[in-house]
Regions:
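Short, gly/Ser/Thr-rich active-site loops of penicillin-recognizing serine hydrolases
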Residues: 112-115, 205-230
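Beta-lactam-recognizing serine transpeptidase/beta-lactamase-like catalytic domain environment
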Residues: 1-200, 214, 218
Length: 230
């Protein structure tokens, strides 16, 4: 299977551009530069493939990760790995809170275990800016979540269902306000359909959804939720 992008991008994308434009090919290049061992070590540090720790009887458990041929490449853009929405949200929170991974809880004012520093504070600051541009810039994939007064940042994901490549899982993880995040919101739509009657206000233009991707459904839903809770 050939790895490709949905649309053609410039060949000289920076790391920031790769994230903003959601380039699969760019992600593969970055992963190869990082190297498989470094990638493995970082994934282990994030705990996204471990059993979730939370005060619930029943929790989703990620599928075992087997490092076979091309696994590094497919993991780099999210197709070669499974995790739970809870763990993904926790990881994104760590990415923007100064780099500290805090285990989630459903208990208010629970005594928090010692958090683990998984990225530097400087890297976290840069990621906040990039995630904001995913929503606010012309090249970004999540402009439908750009709601006045909320300063939303985030990252889109359009993936194949595990074991069924015909079905899609479209996700959007948002953080807001992006300059000093207080909230993280995860929206996941399994095998969504395009609403042919829905007219979007897309960057000042009225249009229908041209693609069945997270930028046109999960992002739209997240924007509506953020407006409601705001």
């Amino acid at each position: 299977h050939e790895i490709e992008d949905m649309k053609e991008h410039p060949s000289n994308l920076s790391v920031e551009d790769i994230l903003i434009r959601s380039s699969n090919l760019g992600s593969v290049i970055l992963a190869k530069k990082i190297g498989e061992e470094n990638y493995k070590n970082f994934i282990k540090k994030t705990k996204i493939i471990e059993n979730p720790e939370i005060e619930l009887e029943e929790v989703g458990v990620p599928h075992q990760l087997n490092w076979n041929k091309c696994k590094l490449e497919t993991i780099s853009f999210g197709h070669g790995i499974t995790t739970t929405p809870l763990q993904a949200t926790s990881l994104y929170a760590a990415m923007v809170n100064g780099g500290k991974l805090v285990l989630p809880s459903i208990i208010q004012d629970r005594k928090i275990k010692k958090s683990e520093q998984i990225i530097s504070n400087e890297t976290s600051n840069e990621l906040r800016k990039i995630l904001r541009k995913v929503v606010s810039s012309e090249e970004g994939t999540a402009s439908l979540a750009d709601k006045d007064g909320f300063h939303v940042g985030g990252k889109t994901g359009t993936a194949e269902s595990y074991g069924d490549k015909k079905n899609r899982i479209n996700t959007f993880i948002s953080i807001f306000p992006a300059n000093k995040p207080n909230y993280s919101l995860f929206v996941m739509l399994e095998n969504p359909k395009i609403n042919k009657e829905l007219i979007y206000d897309y960057r000042g233009t009225k249009t229908k959804a041209p693609y069945n991707t997270s930028g046109w459904n999960s992002v739209y839903v997240a924007g509506k939720i953020i407006e409601k809770i705001g």
